[in-house]
Amino acid sequence: MNMQFRNSSSAAVMAARFLFFPLLVLTLFWADTGKAEILLRDAAGRQVRLAKPAERIVTNESLLLLELALIERDPVSKIAGWAAPRRLDRGVYESFRQRFPTIDAVPVVGGVVPSNTNLESLLSADPDVFVVSLWDPGWQEIAAALEAAGVPTIFLDAPGKSARNPAEAIAFSIDLLGKALGREPEADAFSAYMLSHYQAVVDRLASVKTRPLVLMDAFAGTECCSVPGGANRLTDYLTLAGGRSLGADIIPGYEGRLSPEAVIGEDPPVYIGTGGPHLAGQGGLVLGGGMDAASARASLQAVLSQGVRKELTAVRGKRAYGISHQLAISALSILAFECFAKWVHPELFTDLDPAGTLDEINQRFLAVPLEGTFWIELGETP
């Protein structure tokens, strides 16, 4: 595997700032107003103009809160409206509520997808900018209408399969937000930190010839198994971490289902289930904010005792793991990536410490520390 991210030294990071991220940003200062106009190019290749650093953001994805918390000391104050806040891990939401009680007053506007969004709802929040986390062609019409009303739209996700690898895509997204909010130093610092951690893993994998097969059991519940397809970023993370995702070669889209017969026929040596608090009422894998390790492990054990899972070599050999789905698809995906690398190639990464990485991110970057159990190993000593 031959892949190079930005150099982790600060001087080299700044010197090579746009090697992987051709993000066009021009800031024009007007002496008569004291304001700065910002021009940037988003993930969809669109040139976006902001009259000044954004103070009021409306977004279609409540998970943007974590991204904002990496570069803003008061991320909640920047959110003028959002869609589906209940999608957030409730333990994480409660942590933010303790620090920023006004989070409960953030209005719910629009929807996660364009078909559930109307222009009037978005405009009612009086936004400086509308931020879209996941591309959908339907957003283009809404973006055009917002533009006509004087509100720019920033796409953090590219249409189609991105040419950027997962680490580059996250850094690009952080970079965009940093420019839009006038928080470039903070965005630079986190991007450099994250990319250096990705690079350390990728460098060590360069000489590895074997790529173990992994069952990535998405939203692990009573039935097995829904798996990420070839176009899913989870598949990209696992590939970059030196593994192969079962089913990704036959499921070209975002996700699909594998029959129990297909799963046991392949009998992958590694099992990774994803879950979250929202699966508690469905008999699924529950882990996340505010949860202790013993409860998370018990949940993983319960899921693994069901159906075909208990027959797998991975489960019998205690190479079975669980991880927060939201963590894995968030701006903090470096934590999931380090877990994947450690689980897929344990002999190569005995010293890799995702928990230590989380501690450092909590101390150096996050406005609200991420506390709870976001990943668990079946073979760990309780």
Question: At which residue positions do the language-model features occur?
Answer:
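Extracytoplasmic ligand-binding site segments that recognize negatively charged/polar headgroups
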Residues: 86-91, 138-143, 156-174, 209-233, ...
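Bacterial Sec-exported substrate-binding components of ABC uptake systems
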Residues: 30-69, 185-218, 349-382
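A short, structured surface patch at a secondary-structure boundary
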Residues: 59-61, 65-124, 129, 134-135
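Bacterial N-terminal signal peptides
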Residues: 16-29
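Structured C-terminal subdomain patch of bacterial secreted/periplasmic proteins
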Residues: 110, 164-182, 188, 192, ...
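Short helix-initiation/N-cap motifs at beta->coil->alpha
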Residues: 43-45, 104-118, 251-260
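N-terminal secretory signal peptides that target proteins for export/translocation
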Residues: 1-14
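Alpha-helical, coiled-coil/dimerization segments enriched in small aliphatic residues
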Residues: 229-254
